[in-house]
Amino acid sequence: MINTSIPLVDLHRHLDGNVRVNTIWELGHQHGIALPADSLETLAPFVQIQGKETSLVAFLKKLDWMVAVLADLDAVKRVAYENVADAALSGLDYAELRFSPYYMAMNHKLPIEGVVEAVIDGVKAGLKDYQVKINLIGIMSRSFGQAACAQELEGLLAHKQHLVAMDLAGDELGFPGELFNEHFKRVRDAGLAITAHAGEAAGSQSMWQAIQELGATRIGHGVNAIHDPKLMDYLAKHRIGIESCPTSNLHTSTVSSYAEHPFRTFMDAGVLISLNTDDPGVSAIDIKHEYRIAKSELGLSYAELAQVQRNGVEMAFLSESERKALYAAKA
């Protein structure tokens, strides 16, 4: 399923959506946080998707448990370290880990900049122990409003040298992208790349706004682009990458089934598209699972899967020399 001569990457992967079940259990007990279960085994269904359940509300509840146990900065550092370990152990050559410091800080009123520093420190520690290339993407969580995002941005830009890009995530319908135009002007001025969750809950106009006003060169999910032929042409012509997460889209009810997923439509239209895990801790998947699904459920051939792998490397927020180094390591 995976072509071993091509680097394997995961570009849309939430660090705060990938907390191990045993880590939630241990941190909960360490900090006296009431958990919804009385054993490690019975905790799993509260924090991971089991079977075929597909509901955005259920998904977000599980996600919330992942940050509920971040009681101090050491917990944040541990989770960041384990994210590097998990990326390496799942066979990835390169991953971009994105995180929302406000979301991670809010339950226990941690300092936002302190959370950013703890993530950076945890990743650095992980890279000493594991063979994988990692870059970080900062998230502004739009659901908490403009002021919270401004705070979040301050904490992230204070450490911009450790980031490759900024993302906008959260409630796309309640907090449209135009509320954050000024925030992203600061991101562009700081020299960071931009990706945005768009066209997931809202229509194609949300994607146009992210590209034309925020400055996004990649779009997270973007499933609703397929209803706008002009946008599809634009995406293909300008090599705007779609960070696709099929299993997550199913789990959040963004699509009703794998058969309904537009991945194939994007490929046939010549749009640059990659496979990603989104919140692997919640979905209980790894990148290889997404490639298996792409073959068995989305109907991609081995040649098309190889192209998707190459697309991921092309879409990555890397320099040309870094891209070449990834390929050279596979030779």
UniProtKB/Swiss-Prot annotation:
Catalytic activity: adenosine + H2O + H(+) = inosine + NH4(+); 2'-deoxyadenosine + H2O + H(+) = 2'-deoxyinosine + NH4(+)
Keyword Hydrolase: yes
Keyword Repeat recorded: no
Cofactor mode of binding and number, as noted: Binds 1 zinc ion per subunit.
Disulfide bonds, paired cysteine numbers: none
Biological processes, Gene Ontology terms: adenosine catabolic process; hypoxanthine salvage; inosine biosynthetic process; nucleotide metabolic process; purine ribonucleoside monophosphate biosynthetic process
Site residues (Important for catalytic activity), renumbered to this chain: 221
Signal peptide positions (record): none
Keywords: Hydrolase, Metal-binding, Nucleotide metabolism, Zinc
Cofactor(s) annotated in UniProt: Zn(2+)
Record: residues binding Zn(2+): 12, 14, 197, 278
Active site positions: 200 (proton donor)
EC number: 3.5.4.4
Top EC class of this enzyme: hydrolase
Residues annotated to bind substrate: 14, 16, 170, 279
Alphabetized InterPro entries for the sequence: A/AMP_deam_AS, A_deaminase, A_deaminase_dom, Ado/ade_deaminase, Metal_Hydrolase
Gene3D superfamilies: Metal-dependent hydrolases (3.20.20.140)
Molecular-function annotations in GO: 2'-deoxyadenosine deaminase activity; adenosine deaminase activity; zinc ion binding
PROSITE patterns: A_DEAMINASE
GO cellular component entries: cytosol
Role noted for this protein: Catalyzes the hydrolytic deamination of adenosine and 2-deoxyadenosine.
Family: Belongs to the metallo-dependent hydrolases superfamily. Adenosine and AMP deaminases family. Adenosine deaminase subfamily.
Protein name per Swiss-Prot or TrEMBL: Adenosine deaminase
Encoding gene (name): add
